[in-house]
Amino acid sequence: MNEMKFLQHLKEKGFELTDEQQKQFAIYYETLVEWNEKINLTAVTEKEEVYLKHFFDSITPSFYFDFNKVKSICDVGAGAGFPSIPLKILYPHLEITIVDSLNKRINFLNHLSAELNLTNCHFVHDRAETFGKGEYRESFDVVTARAVARLSVLSELCLPLVKKGGHFIALKGAQGEIEVEEGLFAISILGGAVVENHPLTLPEEESMRYILDIEKKRQTPKKYPRKPGTPNKEPLLK
């Protein structure tokens, strides 16, 4: 997906990028490739692939969820900033917090946000399990995560951070439907309920994606998230 097709596909979905936003995505790509030579941020570096598999893919939740109605987003394990930085470019009013366990990635994100002239961005070096126990617990309108872990694990890392009435939006791959079935037990225990599971195919390569919208119906029990590593080793399964 070249830049023109990127803009065209977004326009078809009702998003017309300003010159400034287009420039931000161009700088994002250049900065990503430059830093990727020093630290491992992504295996995808070809320009057309980055625009499709990182930038466009990160924006897909906005086809189904109105981010104009929310203010704060927490992105768990965003790596090189996906999906929250592309969403921030699209919706400049958003206040985003990214939690990542690798300090090198946090350094990259700090540099990137300065290059893109982004404001109201916070980058936290922490494990999601620890972060979800502290002052930010149940404080975000939306929590996002993309391809970090299976949904049964991811729910324990993300739902504790969502305020009651807020949303956990997970970007999942081809196994999205199976993961939802497997994750229903964990989602319920953690205070969530599945609102929608939107299937879509990425343009050009036609690969399957699912955008999962989980609403936080009740507070998460205090025992969750469990200590670092436990959700992955012992997922909440029926």
Curated annotation (Swiss-Prot):
Q: Where in the cell is it found?
A: Cytoplasm
UniProt entry keywords in alphabetical sequence: Cytoplasm, Methyltransferase, rRNA processing, S-adenosyl-L-methionine, Transferase
Q: Which GO terms describe its cellular component?
A: cytosol
**EC numbers for this chain:** 2.1.1.-
Renumbered residue ranges of the record's region Disordered: 216-238
Q: Which InterPro entries match?
A: rRNA_ssu_MeTfrase_G, SAM-dependent_MTases_sf
> Out of the domains of life, which is the source?
Bacteria
Which Pfam families does the protein's record reference? GidB (PF02527)
Where does this protein hold S-adenosyl-L-methionine?
G77, F82, A128, E129, R146
Q: Which GO terms describe its molecular function?
A: rRNA (guanine-N7-)-methyltransferase activity
Q: What does this protein do?
A: Specifically methylates the N7 position of guanine in position 535 of 16S rRNA.
Family membership, please give it: Belongs to the methyltransferase superfamily. RNA methyltransferase RsmG family.
Q: Which NCBIfam families match?
A: rsmG_gidB
Q: How is this protein named in the record?
A: Ribosomal RNA small subunit methyltransferase G
Q: Which organism is it from?
A: Macrococcus caseolyticus (strain JCSC5402) (Macrococcoides caseolyticum)
Q: What are the leading ranks of the lineage?
A: Bacteria, Bacillati, Bacillota, Bacilli, Bacillales
UniProt lists the gene as: rsmG
